[in-house]
Amino acid sequence: MVDENNLIWIDLEMTGLNPDHDRIIEIATLVTDANLNVLAEGPVLAVHQSDSQLALMDDWNVRTHGASGLTDRVKVSTADERAAELETLAFLQKWVPAGKSPICGNSIGQDRRFLFRYMPELEAYFHYRYLDVSTLKELARRWKPEIMAGFKKQGTHQAMDDIRESLAELVYYRENFLRL
């Protein structure tokens, strides 16, 4: 159900960190209510990239995306960036009006840079604000370091897994750092 207080969580996997020459290879979204209860999981889409684009990945990306199977999924995917953008937007429009949800995730500014470059209609769907879990992580690390051992990430570097971890991490900080 469409609600302007719902939150859109997003994660991208990319061939690298520079949107000037790296590309999106996976996108996933998840919608929660304002209290962080999951309402719906969106499509998880491998985004096709050419072999020449994939060959530009550094060793970390080759290892990580190869081990997870993402590289193989990208090679056989028929979804380009525009198709993935449109499918994601179609899902989000069922849950959140345009311009209402901040972009939510972990180090989400990096994802937004890629959205701006390769999926501008999706990027514009978000409010200009950010709900970045990494902000709380950095504050907790400095102001209450004793709680840092209480949350461990699996670090699969698969988009939906990363979103679920970001959400769980925010819930952890809400309970143990913000104490709400």
Swiss-Prot record:
Role: 3'-to-5' exoribonuclease specific for small oligoribonucleotides.
Source species: Pectobacterium atrosepticum (strain SCRI 1043 / ATCC BAA-672) (Erwinia carotovora subsp. atroseptica)
Protein name: Oligoribonuclease
InterPro entries, alphabetized: Exonuclease_RNaseT/DNA_pol3, Oligoribonuclease, RNaseH-like_sf, RNaseH_sf
EC numbers, comma separated: 3.1.15.-
Record key words, sorted: Cytoplasm, Exonuclease, Hydrolase, Nuclease
Enzyme class: hydrolase
Coiled-coil regions listed in the entry: none
Active-site positions on this chain: Y128
The keyword Cytoplasm appears for this protein: yes
Localisation: Cytoplasm
One of the record's GO cellular component terms: cytoplasm
Domain of life: Bacteria
Pfam families, A to Z: RNase_T
SUPFAM superfamilies named in the record: Ribonuclease H-like
GO terms under biological process: DNA metabolic process
Ranges of residues in domain Exonuclease: 7-170
GO MF entries: 3'-5'-RNA exonuclease activity; nucleic acid binding
Family, per entry: Belongs to the oligoribonuclease family.
